[in-house]
Amino acid sequence: MSVTITKAYFMVPVEDMDRAVRFYGDVLGLSLQFASPEWTELTWRDATIALHRGGGGEPRESWLGFQVDDLDEALVAIEHAGGQRGAERNDGGSRLVSVTDTEGNMLTIGGQPVWG
């Protein structure tokens, strides 16, 4: 069974969204695609960088996420292949699930967001 990925993104936790948008947009030259106080997407060529607010100001790891056409189908495929399903949350109208791949790496899999 194959999952249909509609977008791959590299997620970066930020404390100050405006400051982060200036850094990634003005300094690094990424193009702003979508902005909100909690979630902002910038692109460089075909890559999407998603800024997500939170983290308490401490250094944190970034992580890889995938948006899929059918989240439930993707979760079945991931578990069938030996991945593990983790915590689920609803973030701004998007259903997100943490998963672990077969090598122990954490990923986020999300359904289609309500904002596009």
Residue ranges and their predicted role:
Residues 31-62, 106-112:
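Conserved short beta-strand elements that form part of the metal-binding/catalytic scaffold
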Residues 64-106, 111-114:
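Vicinal oxygen chelate
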Residues 25-26, 43, 79:
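Alpha-helical segments within the soluble intracellular
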Residues 1-19, 48, 62-64, 110-116:
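N-terminal beta-strand motif that seeds the catalytic metal site of vicinal oxygen chelate
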Residues 16-31:
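Amphipathic alpha-helical segments
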Residues 14, 44, 68:
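Aromatic-flanked redox-active Cys/Sec active sites in thiol-based oxidoreductases
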